[in-house]
């Protein structure tokens, strides 16, 4: 369970992905323009060798195969020179990408933790409401039904009762009224 990433509602958010492949290809072509040139020269030499072979010109075929080898050597030199030339820039880019990834992971984690805190608070609120309802229900069950209250308190309760009652409310003080008082407040 420790290896799995934390679930979040932000997992499918496309804002967390930045560089698409076409932008990356364009950037690489701008960084090392000699590599595509060498690849193009190699392909052209192979094409010319194929055409010369179809025509039966063996001298031209050999010349084009040599040109293909030179073009491939040029491409390899361009790749090596570009890697040496852009090494520090690539290292800086990798460090920047790592920092951005860490920042993205931190924001995702913070959002997930905030979401968990909200859910936890909702659970605590629900549990406290549920406990209050249970307390009210237990209080209503523990109330003795056969005993008469003292005459003075009975008169006072009867005087306050018409003001406290609402139309449609039952005359009993059971569980239903306790739940209504909890959810709608004591009126």
Swiss-Prot record:
Its taxonomic placement starts with: Eukaryota, Fungi, Dikarya, Ascomycota, Pezizomycotina
Gene source species = Arthroderma otae (strain ATCC MYA-4605 / CBS 113480) (Microsporum canis)
Q: Which residues cross the membrane?
A: 33-49, 64-86
Question: What quaternary arrangement does the UniProt entry report?
Answer: Associates with the respiratory chain complex III/complex IV supercomplex.
Coiled-coil regions listed in the entry = 86-109
- Locate the compositionally biased regions of type Basic and acidic residues: 153-168
Q: Which Pfam families match?
A: HIG_1_N
The similarity annotation says:
Belongs to the RCF1 family.
Instruction: Please give the name of this protein.
Output: Respiratory supercomplex factor 1, mitochondrial
Q: Name one GO cellular component term.
A: mitochondrial membrane
Report the residue ranges that make up the HIG1 domain in this protein: 6-97
Return the annotated region ranges for Disordered.
136-187
Keywords assigned by UniProt, alphabetized: Coiled coil, Membrane, Mitochondrion, Transmembrane, Transmembrane helix
Q: How does it sit in the membrane?
A: Multi-pass membrane protein
Q: Which cellular compartments is it found in?
A: Mitochondrion membrane
Q: Name one GO biological process term.
A: mitochondrial respirasome assembly
* Function description: Cytochrome c oxidase subunit which plays a role in assembly of respiratory supercomplexes.
Chief location category:
mitochondrion
